[in-house]
Amino acid sequence: MYFAVISIFPEMFATIREFGITGRAVTQKQVTIECINPRDFTSDNYRRIDERPYGGGPGMVMMAEPLSQAIEDARLRASQHGCRVDKAHCPVIYMSPQGQTLSESSVVDMTEYDGMIILCGRYEGIDERLLSQYVDMEISLGDYVLTGGELPAMVLMDSVIRRLPDIMGDDKSAEQDSFVDGLLDCPHYTKPHEFAGMAVPEVLLSGHHANIAKWRFSQQVERTQARRPDLWQAFTPTVEQAKWLKALAKADKK
């Protein structure tokens, strides 16, 4: 999968390109991440990419011209990497608190893309004409504001890359994460058997895979009900999970 990131701080992306699972994916050429600096498309000696807003007000606004040229360069690069450069296959995404909130289901949908062109804003924002002309979607991490779009862009890429086939080593690792089936994840344990007076639940040591699966599901249900009632209300169980829920309800009555 191909990622082009448009940012005035391309150095920030060394972390995602060089470390951890995402770094390994880049090294093994499963993923390509290229950074494009809009300052490279300016014509003045100061390489300015921002100006004061029309109508007055605080702060600066990123100008449309250098960003539009950076996006066109990103589209060319994406095409050279085999991407179908259109909204359906390689969209231009603007990281913005005004966008659609990122979710696990939207991340899974994004794994079907050939690539992404991710636009990172700074200052007071970006000239609206650039957004209306070039941006296909806006994505937010939540109802809060950061100093720029670089960290959200890395979150987006990390979440998508780890869901790509053969990235995690064991694809079941991603399948068991929180939100994948609509519930929070179950608790996990490893050695030693006892820590701070607390032992590993015996069912996990039993080797009985069906009982372990049921226990993990019961823990997911308990956690989701307690911590994220909104997720629980929206949860739709599978046929097998519905049977387990009935069994849990009967056990609670006893």
UniProtKB/Swiss-Prot annotation:
GO MF terms listed in the record are: tRNA (guanine(37)-N1)-methyltransferase activity
Residues involved in S-adenosyl-L-methionine binding: G121, L141, G142, D143, Y144, V145, L146
- What catalytic activity does the UniProt entry give for this protein? guanosine(37) in tRNA + S-adenosyl-L-methionine = N(1)-methylguanosine(37) in tRNA + S-adenosyl-L-homocysteine + H(+)
Where would you find this protein in the cell?
A: Cytoplasm
Keyword annotations of the record = Cytoplasm, Methyltransferase, S-adenosyl-L-methionine, Transferase, tRNA processing
Q: Which InterPro entries does the UniProt record give? A: Alpha/beta_knot_MTases, tRNA_m1G_MeTrfase_C_sf, tRNA_m1G_MeTrfase_TrmD, tRNA_m1G_MTases_N, tRNA_MeTrfase_TRMD/TRM10
Give the superkingdom in one word.
Bacteria
Q: Any one Gene Ontology biological process term? A: tRNA N1-guanine methylation
| CDD domains named in the record | TrmD-like
**UniProt GO cellular component terms:** cytosol
- Please tell me whether the keyword Secreted is annotated for this protein: no
EC number(s) per entry: 2.1.1.228
HAMAP family to which the protein is assigned, alphabetical: TrmD
Assembly behavior: Homodimer.
Per the entry, what this protein does is: Specifically methylates guanosine-37 in various tRNAs.
Q: Which family does it belong to?
A: Belongs to the RNA methyltransferase TrmD family.
Instruction: Specify the protein name.
Output: tRNA (guanine-N(1)-)-methyltransferase
Which species expresses this protein natively?
A: Psychrobacter cryohalolentis (strain ATCC BAA-1226 / DSM 17306 / VKM B-2378 / K5)
